[in-house]
Amino acid sequence: VNKMKPKALFVMLILWLSFTTIQARSTEDVPDKGTYAKFLLVGCYMKPDEEGVRMYRFDGQTADVDYPCGLRGISNPAFLTSDSTGNRIYAIGDDEGKSSTANALLFDKESGLLSLLNSQSTDGELPIYITLSPKEYFVLTANYKGGSITVFSQDKKGKLQRDTKIIRFAGNGPNKKRQEQSHLHCVTFTPDGKFLLATDLGT
């Protein structure tokens, strides 16, 4: 499948995790460097033995960037999302076969370190997008080559469970080279949380 990928390694989504060291202070206080610190999470097309998820610390006052850590263990974690707290990060494994995965990560705000909680197969090849349900009970992936959406539940610690539900799409489109089958690109909920929307390149 001729799936379009960006030419650069640094990919698709940069998460601005706007937490860290902001504290109440008067307008006369001189802010220290940490006051403006934000974390950037970058997903990359990289092999599992490389740091495909990268954490950068960005200073909003000086625009200085440093690289405190990265995370190995995921094949092509090219799209990331976070929960509402910023403590849990979710990444796709944009690959085929057993390497087609959804991945749950923990982010420690104090240390700025990432850790991999667990990975589960999407049972749909080339997952390209990942999102959370409105109440964050479920994690969903859009699987490009699989032509499907995979729905994962999570336990209280944020680990993805194996009891998946798969929504499969069928059909094709007028461009026989690109639309020979369903190719899911994105899945998201409407603002009221009542409906799930999906975009399909293949039909």
Predicted feature descriptions by range:
Residues 1-33:
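Bacterial Sec-dependent N-terminal signal peptides
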Residues 28-58:
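An edge-strand/N-cap motif at the start of beta-rich repeat modules
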Residues 34-36, 82-86, 132-136, 191-192:
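Residue-level detector of Asp-centered blade-edge/turn motifs that repeat once per structural unit
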Residues 36, 49, 75-78, 126-128, ...:
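Beta-rich catalytic cores
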Residues 46-49, 95-99, 145-148, 203:
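Short glycine/acidic-enriched loop and turn motifs that connect beta-strands
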Residues 112-186:
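Asp-box/WD-like beta-propeller blade repeats and closely related beta-sheet repeat scaffolds
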